[in-house]
A protein has these predicted regions:
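Conserved alpha/beta enzyme-core scaffold
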Residues: 2-122
Length: 122
C-alpha cells in the first residue's frame, strides 16, 4: 500500500479489507496479506489490519501498537530494513511476488494519469 506517514495512505481500503478478513476467518478461512509501504502509516491501516489478524508480513517500518504486539508474539513476520532499500528489493524479487498495489491518489487526469497524494514516499 502506498504510505509515507499518516497523511499519505489509502483511507477506505484497509477497513473494508479488515472486515473481509474477519469474515473469512470466522468462516474458517485464513486470509492474510503482506503489507509493504514507503514508511509508517496510521492505525487506520496497520491497526485495523493487525487487529483483524490479517497481516502475514509487514515491512519496512511500522509504529502501530497492535502490529508491534503481534510481531513480538511471533504472529506477524516483520522485516526491518532501511526505507531506501525497499524499492530495490522489490524490483529484484527479493520480497516475493507483489500481487496488488493500493495507492492513494487525489485525482485521475482525462488521459488516465494519476495524481498521487503525499503517499508516494519511496
Amino acid at each position: 500500500m502506498s504510505g509515507f506517514t499518516g497523511a499519505g495512505y489509502p483511507k477506505a481500503i484497509p477497513p473494508a479489507l479488515a472486515r473481509h478478513i474477519e469474515q473469512s476467518n470466522q468462516e474458517g478461512g485464513q486470509f492474510r496479506i503482506g503489507v509493504w509501504t514507503g514508511a509508517s502509516t496510521a492505525p487506520e491501516l496497520d491497526g485495523v489490519l493487525a487487529q483483524a489478524h490479517g497481516i502475514q508480513m509487514r515491512l519496512p517500518y511500522q509504529s502501530d501498537p497492535s502490529c508491534r504486539q503481534l510481531i513480538n508474539a511471533g504472529q506477524m513476520l516483520y522485516t526491518d530494513m532501511h526505507l531506501s532499500h525497499v524499492a530495490q528489493f522489490a524490483w529484484f524479487g527479493f520480497l516475493g511476488k507483489l500481487d496488488v498495489a493500493v495507492v492513494e491518489v487525489v485525482g485521475v487526469l482525462p488521459d488516465g494519469r494519476l495524481i498521487p497524494s503525499t503517499s508516494v514516499g519511496n
